[in-house]
Amino acid sequence: MGTTNGCAADSVAATYYDSQDADQFYEQVWGGEDIHIGLYATPDEAIATASDRTVHALLDLADPLPQGGCVVDLGAGYGGASRRLARWSERPVHAINISAVENDRHRRLNVDAGLEQQITVHDASFEQVPMADASADLVWSQDAILHAGDRAKVLAEVSRLLKPGGCFVFTDPMAADGVEMGLLQPILDRIHLPDLASPSRYKAWGEAVGLTMEVWDERTEMLVRHYDRVRQDTRLRRAELETSISSGYLDRMDVGLGHWVDGGQQGRLSWGLMRLRKPG
């Protein structure tokens, strides 16, 4: 990305996700466990069910893991994936997240799940992860790196963290390859970003730091379905949601979700599952 200072981008993301409105919205509409795009079996499937399916699809991409290292979750949100990773991998999980509000909820949920000793939640940016080189077998991220001030630097951190043979599995809302950023201005304005990554840019950033793209499973239709599903659910539950979320926030969210749906339908956006590997 490179056009936004990393600290400034961190501040924008933290301010947004730390707000009471955002915290309540993601808890009530997404279910309070995950904050990422779902893989839907049917158009009207529950958001939480579809979101959980994405986690399992990424777990399939990560399997099998090498032995001996830990797992790092970049942009861990409420920790839904971190808890699944802890149970699945049976090894330490380090959750990196900039939002103090999300991290507080994450820690409480870890205690409820009996996983507080296995999962360490770091109040940190994924551009400067407070961990040693070559310490992770798996780095994981879901729909978070778009908020980074320098996405190439995030890929460099991933390469630094991974042990030889380890892999990085992730999803991220992106621009379709070759799309001019001006065509995405309504989306960029909504999320306070100058641009989005693209599949080819992630491939190039990975190669520049020694990571090879092994899998690119394009599922852009799920981005469209997800944001449309969230918008429908928000509209149906408007009266209920207004008891804890401001009407202005809900109005802005409705408009923003519409921009994502339109961009996906117009072929200007891209989303899917990716795996990059550090050669052994």
UniProtKB/Swiss-Prot annotation:
Task: State the top-level EC class.
Answer: transferase
Give GO terms for biological process: glycine betaine biosynthetic process from glycine; methylation
Q: How does activity depend on pH?
A: Optimum pH is around 8.5 for dimethylglycine.
Entry keyword annotation includes Isomerase? no
Give a yes or no for keyword Methyltransferase in this entry: yes
Recorded metabolic or biological pathway in which this protein acts: Amine and polyamine biosynthesis; betaine biosynthesis via glycine pathway; betaine from glycine: step 3/3
Transmembrane feature ranges: none
Q: Which Pfam families match?
A: Methyltransf_11
Q: List the coiled-coil residues.
A: none
Q: Which InterPro entries match?
A: Erg6_SMT_methyltransf, Methyltransf_11, SAM-dependent_MTases_sf
Q: Which reaction does it catalyse?
A: N,N-dimethylglycine + S-adenosyl-L-methionine = glycine betaine + S-adenosyl-L-homocysteine + H(+)
Alphabetical UniProt keywords? Methyltransferase, S-adenosyl-L-methionine, Transferase
What Enzyme Commission number does this protein have? Answer: 2.1.1.161
Query: Example GO molecular function term?
Result: dimethylglycine N-methyltransferase activity
Lineage: superkingdom = Bacteria
Quaternary context: Monomer.
Similarity comment: Belongs to the methyltransferase superfamily.
Q: What does this protein do?
A: Catalyzes the methylation of dimethylglycine to betaine with S-adenosylmethionine (AdoMet) acting as the methyl donor. It has strict specificity for dimethylglycine as the methyl group acceptors.
State the protein's name: Dimethylglycine N-methyltransferase
Species source reads Parasynechococcus marenigrum (strain WH8102)
Gene of this entry: bsmB
